[in-house]
Amino acid sequence: VGIDLSPTAVAAATEAAAERGLSNATFVCADITSFTGYDGRFGTIFDSTLFHSLPVEGREGYLRSIRRAAAPGARYYVLVFATGAFPPEAEAKPHEVSEQELRDAVAPYFTINDVRPAYIHANSPEGMPAPPDAPRDDQGRLLMPAFLLSAHAEN
């Protein structure tokens, strides 16, 4: 189940899944900080670059909602931009997260197994110059500093 606040994004994801023959993929329009109806349903929850996009004051509701949706023993993975991922002069950027900030936010809801350095492979955002020495993958995407947290829900 994919959850997004935007009906346009939900429609696009639904169409893309249908084009790929993914008949068991579903997408719903809901606020990720307060969704209900999935209590104990998911054995794996993966947050790929959402956490750092939320307003800091929305994190508690988000984590409470996904913890409620987690089955006993569920695995939870979070990929976030690390502090320093964007140039200091960048005007528009997501909230970069320190390892400790990530741990402090998640620990009341899940048992943290590991937080490790990672990269987010990204196209250079419009209007955001990439440092000339920035590492890139074989497709030319920027390798932006990140953290990957893995955790689990206690029974």
PLM feature spans:
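A conserved beta-strand element that flanks and buttresses the S-adenosyl-L-methionine
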Residues: 46
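Class I (Rossmann-like) S-adenosyl-L-methionine-dependent methyltransferase catalytic domain
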Residues: 1-40, 54-155
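Conserved acidic residues
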Residues: 43
